Regions:
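Detector for intrinsically disordered, low-structure N-terminal pre-sequences
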Residues: 3, 31, 55, 93-94
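Charge-rich, solvent-exposed alpha-helical interaction surfaces
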Residues: 7-10, 14, 87-97
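N-terminal non-cleavable signal-anchor helices
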Residues: 33, 45, 57, 95-96
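Short stretches within intrinsically disordered, low-complexity N-terminal or propeptide regions
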Residues: 37, 60, 89-92, 100
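Intrinsically disordered, low-complexity regulatory segments enriched in Ser/Thr/Pro
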Residues: 43-90
Length: 102
C-alpha cells in the first residue's frame, strides 16, 4: 500500500505528463488545483460557427484524487477515484466520450 506522499507524487507526475497545469490556487486544505481545457468549434444551422469548451480540474486530498468537470463554464459534477492512475484513465475516457481529443 502506498503512502499519501507517494500517491501525491504520482498524481503530480501524471498531471504534468498529461498537460495539466497548476491554476495557482488551492482548495480549503491547501492542496494544489490542476486544470486543463479543451475547445472545439462546430457549425450550427442558422447560427454559424459555435465554440464549446470542456474543462477538468483535479486535486488530491488525503491520497484521494478528486476531479470536477465543466462544460461551457457549467459544473457537470465531481468525482473521486481510488488512485491517480484510475483518475487519469477516467478523465481520458470522459473527455473522449464528450467529443474532444485528449
Amino acid at each position: 500500500m502506498k503512502s499519501i506522499q507517494q500517491t501525491r507524487n504520482e498524481f503530480f507526475r501524471l498531471m504534468a505528463d498529461n498537460g495539466f497545469e497548476s491554476t495557482g490556487s488551492a482548495d480549503y486544505d491547501g492542496n494544489v488545483i490542476f486544470a486543463r481545457e479543451w475547445t472545439r468549434t462546430c457549425q450550427v444551422v442558422w447560427y454559424g460557427e459555435c465554440a464549446s469548451t470542456y474543462r477538468v480540474t483535479a486535486r488530491i486530498s488525503f491520497g484521494t484524487p478528486l476531479i470536477q468537470l465543466y462544460e461551457n463554464g457549467r459544473l457537470l459534477g465531481q468525482r473521486d477515484y481510488s488512485s491517480p492512475k484510475r483518475a487519469m484513465n477516467a478523465i481520458r475516457e470522459i473527455v473522449r466520450c464528450a467529443g474532444y481529443a485528449f
